[in-house]
Each structure stands twice: as C-alpha cells, then as structure tokens.
Amino acid sequence: MEGEEMKRKLCILLCGTLAAGMLTACGGKNEMTGSETNAKSTGEEETVTIWHDGDEAIMGVIEDTVNKKIADENVSIKFEKKTGLTDQLKLYGNDQANGPDMYLYAHDSLGMLAEMGILAPVTDFISADDEADLLPMTVEAGTYKDTQYVLPLYYESLLFIYNKDLWKGALPKTTDDLLSYMKENTDVDAGTYAVVNQHSTAYNVAPVINGFDGYIIDKDAKPGLDDANTIKAVEYNKKFAELMGEGDYDTCNTLFNEQKAQAIIGGPWLVSGIKDAGINYGICSLADFTLPNGKSLAPYSGVQGVGILKYAEENKKDAITSVLKALCSTEIGVALAKESNCAPANQEAYKDEEVAANEMIMAMKTTAESAEPMPNIPQMSVMWGPAESMLAAVNKSGEDVEASAEKYQEEAEAAIADMQ
C-alpha cells in the first residue's frame, strides 16, 4: 500500500510540474505576441526599424516628418543604412532578431524579394482609401503578381534637359519635329550636337520602345526584343542615333556640361552637375513629345518605396500601420519635394505652391501619366544584357534590326531559362 501511495504522490508531482511548464511556455508566447500592446499600455515607445541603401539626407527628411506626425501614438521610425541592401535582406529577411521591420529601396527588386516569401502585403495594414492620393503608376510599381508589397514614396524618370542659351526657338511638340531640329543643328565633324542620348542603353531607349507599344520583357517574363512593335521602335530610334556617334553616359554628360550639346536626355541625378557647370537650363517631360503613332514617349520610372518584413507583421502590426498611414500623407510628399527635390508619390503634394513651381518635379509629374514602372520581375535582371547588345549591334555596328532582334531574343530566352 505504501508503494502505491508513493506512486500516486509522484504522479501528482510530475503532472503538476508538467502543467507548470506548459503554463510558463504559453505565458512566454503571449508575452512575445503581446509586446506591442504591453509597450503601449506602459507608455513605452515602439520603434520601427527601416533599412535603406540610399541618400541619408532624404531618409532624414522622411524620419523627421513621420516621427512628428505619429509622436502621440508612442511610435517612431529609425533608418539604418545597409550597403548592398538586397544581399542583406537575403541574409536577414527571415531573422527577426537581426533583421529590420521594414526596408526602403527601389521597386525593381520587389519580385526577387517577394519570391523569397519574406514580405507581408501592404494591404494587410492599410486600405485602398489610405492610398487614394497616390499616383496609380507608383502603386503599380509596388505590386507583384497582383499583390502590393511596396508603399511608394517618390519616383524618378528620364527628362528632356536643355540649355536655354543654346536652344533655338520653342521646343518641338513631336519627335519628328525634334529629329528635324537635330538634323539642322548637329555637326558631328565639329563635335556639336542638338540632343545627346545613350542610344545603346536600354533604359534610355525604353521611352521609344514603350511608346511604340513594344516591350523589353512583359509581366509573364516573356522577352519582347523580336516583337514587331519593338522592332519598329528600334528602327525609328536609329534615326536619332545616327546623329550622335558614340554616346555613353560620361560622353553625353560631358558634351552637355561643356555646352557642346544643346540638350540631353537624362535623369534628375544629372541636375547637380549641370548646376555646377553654370548652365542656364530648362526641363520638360518626355511625355511632351508625341511619336508618329500619336502616343507620347513613355520612359521607365523607378519608384522608391517601403516594404514590410513578414515577421514584423506578427509583432508590430499596429505600429507599422501607423507608420504606413503617415507615409501616405500629403505632408510626407511636400517635405520630400521641398527639402529633397524628389517627385512625391502623393498627388496632393503637387498642389503646394512651392512644389508646383518646381520645374523638374512638375515635369516628372507630367511624365508619370505615361511612364511605365520598370519591370519588377526577377527575370528583368538578365534582360539588360541582350537588349543592349541588340541596340549596340544596330546603332554602332549597323546590323539589320530584325536579324539582331531574332539573335538577341534567343539569347534572352536562354538566359531566362537558365534562371529556372
């Protein structure tokens, strides 16, 4: 009997110990998932960490503006710069202890990150009403396979930048008239040009390709180098390339800054150098030029926005929701435009008097109506090589457009197949 009684007591003791252990484990889990609620209830501030690899000054503008806007919600953001951001996210995208809550980067990396399964949809946090003031093109840029993973903040595109002291008369309204002006005002032997552009760089020829309804690659990862409209576009662009000779990035910039070219097709990143060169410059949108088919030039647009790491949704959903709503605001857009000279994703920001007076920003706003977001699918990374080889073959080596298109279409298809 004593033995049976001892067994009964031992059983009770073990069961009690096991139950206590289970309660401790459940309590620990509740403490983790409820950390945000606990922080709010005790008045502690919840910090949302955002990794970036961009301009520290721009991040400072965003950080200051957001933190002022959500100060009464016990939430703040903190930017941390990480060189080689996509590689860092590959390493830490599933590491809650060492990774960020969010990241800010160019939208064209989205497909790769989404395929890794590390991102949470923006729509898990905010509604379409919250994003109602955002330019549709920028929202499209942050969408991959019908799911929005990136909230857009600002964007950029190619522009038509001209020297007001050299340009003769009014700017043309059609690309045909622009071509005529170039023929009349270009002297290759003397080294003076009307307009310079990187004609063997796919990004710089994309405005013509897109405007002709051609494409470099579509959303289904099908290369479009041999598409009939792409071929027409490259044939048409060749007329402009023939008036230039070599036109790499440095050559084009030097020609314009040394006032040997009246105009250049380039992005907002050129403006500081142009100012330093003392040039009296003007800017207009590429969308202001109409192609022979009646459509506007349609450059690619690069959009900078924020994405959310999936594990952060579990622990900081309320805090991140507050941050995203603040980032959607007109105040952020106005601050980015005024303090950083960025074209904001928020449409209401352009109603600000000072923003509306900014020629470069308003030119990009016009461009946003026809611009196409740069493809954000992973396969785009292997398309630049074949596309630019095709353009170089046509514009530098004088090869037949259709033959080159066929050759480099096959090369592109092989490169994509190798990614599988």
Could you tell me what each predicted segment is?
Residues 11-15, 26-110, 292-293, 315-318, ...:
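Conserved N-terminal structural module of periplasmic/extracytoplasmic solute-binding proteins
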Residues 147-153, 158, 177-223, 229, ...:
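Extracytoplasmic/periplasmic solute-binding protein
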Residues 337-393, 417-418:
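Long, aromatic- and glycine/proline-rich binding clefts that accommodate carbohydrate-like moieties
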Residues 67, 235-316:
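Extracytoplasmic/periplasmic substrate-binding proteins
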Residues 107-158, 173, 177-179, 187-189, ...:
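Hinge/lid segment of periplasmic solute-binding proteins
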Residues 69-134, 165, 170-173, 262-263, ...:
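Extracytoplasmic "Venus flytrap"/periplasmic binding protein-like
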Residues 90-91, 98-101, 129-165, 193-194, ...:
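A structural signal for short loop-to-beta-strand junctions that line the ligand-binding cleft
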Residues 182, 220-249:
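Glycine-centered hinge/linker elements that transmit conformational signals in sensory
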